[in-house]
């Protein structure tokens, strides 16, 4: 983690995070472009979670790669270690989270967005009655590249718009209080890695 904990400047936003080292992010790019990984983990058009998992590019225009939680690839493990460091700072900022039993236990995704792409519809991360969804406590996301024009993540209720910066990692509650969407970047591609912390027994 580079520097100190970041609290997104919006009243009680509960959106925070930090910045990961460039070499960690470069490792994720290497993983994405690794032909050996493409044979193991298929890249597929992005599905619209909570909408019957259909593909609709008017809602979500992306290519996604799902990564198993317990993969042993050094590039992914290095990222998970960095995410854990930022998560500890988030919990230090919101210490009531220590009273809840949660962990990183579900698979997660690297998502590539073409020019003009994005998850363009407001959505939250706990959006149906599936056990995977209802146990989500927090979402997390890291931007894998800088975007000069557009590409922001808009948190609607908080009226917070976060500009993509390589390594910037955000954590936020998974509930309806944090409906958000991705603003299209008209002239640039965008890449993120994203997933959830879930309740555990």
What do these predicted regions represent?
Residues 104-118:
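A short glycine-rich, His/Asp/Glu-containing loop-to-beta-strand
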Residues 119-127:
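Histidine-centered catalytic micro-motifs
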Residues 32, 95, 114, 126, ...:
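Short beta-strand segments enriched in hydrophobic/aromatic residues
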Residues 2-101, 105-107:
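Non-heme Fe(II)/2-oxoglutarate
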Residues 134-136, 149-201:
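Catalytic core of Fe(II)/2-oxoglutarate
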């Amino acid at each position: 983690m580079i520097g100190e904990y970041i609290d997104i400047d919006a009243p009680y936003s509960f959106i925070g995070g930090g910045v990961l080292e460039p070499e960690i992010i470069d490792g994720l790019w290497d993983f994405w472009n690794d032909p050996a990984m493409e044979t193991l983990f298929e890249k597929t058009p992005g599905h619209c979670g909570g909408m019957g998992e259909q593909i609709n590019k008017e809602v979500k225009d992306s290519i996604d790669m799902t990564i198993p939680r317990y993969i042993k690839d050094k590039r992914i493990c290095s990222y998970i270690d960095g995410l854990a460091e930022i998560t500890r700072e988030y919990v230090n900022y919101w210490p009531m989270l220590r009273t809840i039993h949660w962990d990183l236990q579900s698979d997660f995704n690297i998502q590539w967005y073409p020019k003009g792409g994005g998850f363009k519809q407001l959505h939250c991360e706990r959006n149906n009655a599936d056990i995977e969804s209802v146990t989500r406590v927090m979402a997390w996301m890291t931007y894998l590249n800088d975007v000069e024009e557009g590409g922001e993540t808009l948190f609607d209720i908080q009226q917070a718009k976060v500009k993509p910066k390589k390594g910037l990692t955000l954590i936020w509650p998974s509930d309806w209080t944090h409906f958000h969407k991705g603003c299209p970047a008209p002239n640039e591609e965008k890449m993120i890695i994203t997933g959830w912390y879930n309740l555990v027994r």
